[in-house]
Regions:
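N-terminal Rossmann NAD(P)H-binding glycine-rich loop of SDR-like oxidoreductase domains
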Residues: 4, 8-32
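NAD(P)H-binding glycine-rich loop region in Rossmannoid oxidoreductase-like domains
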Residues: 54-99, 103, 107
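Conserved Rossmann-fold NAD(P)-dependent oxidoreductase catalytic core, especially the SDR/UDP-sugar
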Residues: 99-145
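Active-site Tyr-X1-5-Lys
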Residues: 140-169
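Substrate-positioning beta->alpha
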Residues: 151, 181-185, 197-220, 226
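NAD(P)-dependent short-chain dehydrogenase/reductase
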Residues: 159-204
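Mid/C-terminal beta-alpha module of Rossmann-like enzyme folds, strongest
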Residues: 202-203, 213-273
């Protein structure tokens, strides 16, 4: 169905505003006429005119003061990364989320956009292909990143439940890549191409940070209420990922031998075509 007409411009706070996605979100929101304040622990030059960047630690800052007069919060600084393994990391990040939600409720924030992950669905053999937003959230219990994101969703849902004046958008993106961090993509591709099982080789999906930023901005514009998968239409086979990564599969070795390309040199092709 068509999306509803955009709402008027509002005051928006974006956490994690200096990251690859955060900078894009801030710039696009400002271009749409919103008053944008970015919050991050790292200092940064504003990505566009009309964006104010404040250096704050969400774990200790006065969030009620920072969110006063704000209509929408886009929470991108939302927790652990897929590479984190420490047992306390997720708890610390969830404490920050709890503080943010409490402050948002106290000052009357009306719309919350949170970045979750498609990994909250879990890698289960009975998953349908493709997965839709109607699929149950059941992360693999040993995968800290996915468990954390599922808990984040639960906390955000509790914030919105029972309050008809509160709108919650939950973004569930596929693995997101950007030109600024090609090394992270290399690790993901390498790990995926090394997986084998009786069910066959894994399928991969990759999302450009531009597209995730556009999804967040669209959610703000129409005040989208509910979960939203953010992913490409199709997927990439293990053979193609090996071609792009240049390792973890004999095809990659053959390509390197026959073409002279260094392992990993074709990762740019993936980014350029997303």
């Amino acid at each position: 169905p068509p999306l509803p007409a955009p709402y008027p411009a509002v005051r928006v706070v974006v956490t994690g505003s200096t990251g690859a996605v955060g900078r894009r979100v801030c710039a696009r929101l400002a271009a749409d006429g919103h008053e944008v304040v970015g919050l991050d622990r790292r200092s940064s030059v504003p990505p566009a005119p009309g964006v104010e960047i404040r250096v704050v630690d969400l774990a200790v800052a006065d969030l009620r003061d920072l969110l006063s007069g704000v209509d929408t919060v886009v929470h991108l600084a939302s927790g652990v990364t897929a590479g984190d393994v420490g047992g306390n990391t997720g708890h610390d990040r969830l404490a920050v989320v709890e503080r943010l939600l409490a402050a948002a409720g106290d000052v009357g924030v009306g719309h919350l956009v949170v970045r979750s992950s498609a990994m909250v669905y879990g890698a289960w053999p009975d998953n349908p292909v493709p997965l839709t937003e109607d699929a149950p959230v059941r992360p693999c219990p040993d995968f800290l990143f996915a468990v954390h994101r599922a808990r984040l969703e639960e906390m955000a849902a509790a914030w919105a439940d029972g309050h008809p004046d509160r709108v919650l958008t939950v973004l569930r993106p596929a693995v997101t890549v950007a030109e600024e961090r090609p090394g992270g993509l290399a690790s993901v591709v390498g790990a995926a191409t090394s997986i084998r099982s009786d069910e066959g080789e894994p399928l991969g999906q990759f999302l450009h940070s531009d597209d995730l930023a556009d999804a967040a901005v669209c959610a703000v514009a129409v005040r989208y209420d509910g979960p939203l998968n953010v992913a490409p239409d199709g997927w990439i086979s293990a053979v193609v990922m090996a071609d792009l990564g240049g390792y973890g599969h004999r095809v990659g070795s053959l390509l390197a031998a026959e073409t002279g390309r260094e392992p990993g040199s074709d990762l740019r092709r993936l980014i350029d075509h997303l």
